Amino acid sequence: MTVIQRSILIFSLIFISLPQGIVKANNFYKEAVIIGGYSDRDQWIGKKGKSLKNSIGFEYYRKFANDYGDFLTLDVQMRMAYDSTEDSQDAFGIEVHNAWAEHKLGLGRSIRFGHFDPAFGLEPVLDTHGTLLQTLASKNIGFKKDWGIAYKGLLGDYDYEIASQIGSGMGIKRKDGSFLLTSRIGTPQTSEFQYGLSFLYGQTLQSSQSWTIPVSDLVSGKSVRKKRIGIDMQRQLGLFDLKAEAAAGDNDGRTVAGGMVELGYTVPEQQNLKIKMQTLYWSDDWDEKKARDLTLAPVIEYKISSSATMRLGYFHDIYSSSDEDKLILLQLYYFGL
């Protein structure tokens, strides 16, 4: 067991054993993802991806307060996942998504440490943990979460966050000088029209799987130097909601860029039914046409209850850096007490 893995175990024990007298909120959520579909390329499939495998898990969330209000928030979210595309001995693993503590310093300032979103783009302000449609994060940074420390504060009417992380994503390892520095400044999440500006600099690793335990093998032993600037926005327009982001920069000197636009519509006669359309583009080498991905994805989402949601999506690759594909996915997602 590595030093970092031992630290996570100690953190979890402390997390659970903190005194109950100062608990303001204490919730234990259960989670399940059942997903499958049909692909032109692979025929009947489970979804091979960074966060959409079949899985069961939980989220344990606690908030602590004193006479002056809440001062500490702790969150652990993990799941046992199954990847049907792997051999039996490699098909199961544990994904630690959230494992962080955040301490309020007052005046809108706080400090966070653990496993959390890098401060870049839409991912820190959206919950895409169990959804079919994803942000640019996995293609842009290479992962959605990383291990490290972050500081949040206020700059006039804007929120800002600065994060320093180890550049490994889900896995708990550093190699070849990996690190990740990110920052984002944007409007408060309570605003009807939200927008943000982000910056990124680092050397990141790419894992062959998204497991935290066991630690996945690296695709390459060398880290990739990344520089990015990005913009993002969200806007509620009556029954419509619009999300968009774009990022550009370089990977080891190669120009990279991409964008995502997503439009959602809530059916007025059936508020539990939502229709979404997403276009996502990413190029890992702007000068090489074969390095680009462009996917169109309409998704129908129906909320069965406050805890269960059914999603049906069609993903059509217009361009792909690997083999172009068309696939239909059906997902049942449960998240409740």
What are the functions of these language-model segments?
Residues E324-L337:
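Outer-membrane beta-barrel "beta-signal"
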Residues N27-G36, D70-V76, R109-I111, Y160-I162, ...:
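Transmembrane beta-strands of outer-membrane beta-barrel proteins
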Residues N26-I35, G46-G167, G177-F179, G186-Q194:
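Outer membrane beta-barrel
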Residues I34-D42, S55-G57, R62-F64, M78-S84, ...:
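Transmembrane beta-strands of outer-membrane beta-barrel pores
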Residues D70, L155, G186-D287, Y334:
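Detector for outer-membrane/organellar transmembrane beta-barrel domains
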Residues G57-Y61, A99-E102, A150-K152, R184-G186, ...:
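Outer-membrane beta-barrel architecture
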